[in-house]
Amino acid sequence: MKKYRDHYFLKAKRENYPARSVYKLKEIDKRFGILKQGMRVLDLGAAPGSWSLGAAEKIGPSGRVLAADIQTTETVFPPNVTFMQEDVFERSAEFEQALSETGPFDVVISDMAPKTTGHKFTDQARSSNLCFEALAVASLHLVEGGSFVVKIFMGPDVEAYVKQMRTLFTAVKSFKPKSSRSESKETFYIGLGFKGLPEFSEQEGED
């Protein structure tokens, strides 16, 4: 195990986080200042729960985190975090209700990653699908001015994805945390200042 991996792995154990990924979110927040007291946060791909715990600490007891993942987790969350086992592509009525009751959200964060096959292009395509779905959910449930954080594995679809992000946010930034493994293809994109969905006029819908 490399020294930098030792450092973040052991640090997570000492600080009672289930995974080292929490430090990626902390770096992103330190750089862009997206998390504040009292905010409502939607965490997609939340298991095992490090990002939810990190967000919950920053937003405090008056804030709320709604966390979802297709996998379950044994992590014990504080009272301001609600975890639901959900498939973001096939959202249940219960999850849709939770989205409505907890949202709209000030921040949507997505650390979703597909099960890897070892085939570069297949893995990139699956990652891209998750990213587009996360963006779709964010666009429906963010407040105007809200922020979006998404993990992307670099590939041929990234340019089109970022182009779509730019239509929805006033600024889009890329960021590679120091706590990411140097050999990892992951990069995080941060959308700042959600503009809201474009209005659809009746004339546009006419033939």
UniProtKB/Swiss-Prot annotation:
Pfam families in alphabetical order: FtsJ
Binding site for S-adenosyl-L-methionine: G49, W51, D69, D87, D111
EC number(s) from the headed UniProt entry: 2.1.1.166
Gene for this chain: rlmE
Matches recorded under PANTHER family: RIBOSOMAL RNA METHYLTRANSFERASE, RRNA METHYLTRANSFERASE 2, MITOCHONDRIAL
Catalysis performed (reactions): uridine(2552) in 23S rRNA + S-adenosyl-L-methionine = 2'-O-methyluridine(2552) in 23S rRNA + S-adenosyl-L-homocysteine + H(+)
An example Gene Ontology CC term for this record: cytoplasm
Protein name per UniProt: Ribosomal RNA large subunit methyltransferase E
Family matches, as Gene3D superfamilies: Vaccinia Virus protein VP39
Bilayer-spanning residue ranges: none
Active-site residues per Swiss-Prot or TrEMBL entry: K151 (proton acceptor)
Sorted UniProt keywords: Cytoplasm, Methyltransferase, rRNA processing, S-adenosyl-L-methionine, Transferase
Gene Ontology MF annotations: rRNA (uridine-2'-O-)-methyltransferase activity
Subcellular location: Cytoplasm
Family as reported in the entry's similarity comment: Belongs to the class I-like SAM-binding methyltransferase superfamily. RNA methyltransferase RlmE family.
SUPFAM superfamilies in alphabetical order: S-adenosyl-L-methionine-dependent methyltransferases (SSF53335)
